Amino acid sequence: MLVFAGLGNPGKTYENTRHNVGFMTIDELSKEWNIPLDKTKFNGQYGIGFVSGKKVLLVKPLTYMNLSGECLRPLLDYYEIPVDNLKVIYDDLDLPTGRIRLRTKGSAGGHNGIKSTIQHLGTSEFNRIRIGIGRPVNGMKVVDYVLGAFTDEEEPAIKEAVRQSAKACEASLEKPFLEVMNEFNAKV
């Protein structure tokens, strides 16, 4: 089974914030693939279905961002899914708004959701899809920025980035992640 995990914060308050682009991508995949997120277990909301003949699990950890690993580790253990089958989708301050970047491993880069995931998985070697949200300007605190809504100017770029992230997830069903990474990272 392949797992696509979108990181974010639960609840209406955070629904359309920069920190929730991972959740937005999972919602997009849920619609496209007709996989309802109808299960709640392991501190996560998830659904299981078949896409292109492959069994797929979509999950949104409901632990709040900084504790995301507390959902992912037990979920992988319960379904006996190797870490190699996991793709984590999340926001990245170090990428320009709307840009996506795929990686096969790496540090948390200051992202607490990834830090928790690395800690609970016991490895930093898992596939990632990073969605750029840019950096705050005019002295705005990072926490206020990531928990803030996108501006009207940012909306189109973010919607396209979520679509591209979903396309990268879909491509990874048919091709090795490294090949998908090279393809999508080459796009400007």
Swiss-Prot record:
Positions with a binding annotation for tRNA: 14, 64, 66, 112
Origin: domain of life: Bacteria
Coiled coil: none
Gene Ontology molecular function, alphabetical: peptidyl-tRNA hydrolase activity; tRNA binding
Keywords associated with the record: Cytoplasm, Hydrolase, RNA-binding, tRNA-binding
Site location (Discriminates between blocked and unblocked aminoacyl-tRNA): 9
Residues flagged as site, Stabilizes the basic form of H active site to accept a proton: 91
Main location: cytoplasm
Catalytic activity: an N-acyl-L-alpha-aminoacyl-tRNA + H2O = an N-acyl-L-amino acid + a tRNA + H(+)
Protein role: Hydrolyzes ribosome-free peptidyl-tRNAs (with 1 or more amino acids incorporated), which drop off the ribosome during protein synthesis, or as a result of ribosome stalling. Catalyzes the release of premature peptidyl moieties from peptidyl-tRNA molecules trapped in stalled 50S ribosomal subunits, and thus maintains levels of free tRNAs and 50S ribosomes.
NCBIfam families, A to Z: pth
Name by which UniProt lists this protein: Peptidyl-tRNA hydrolase
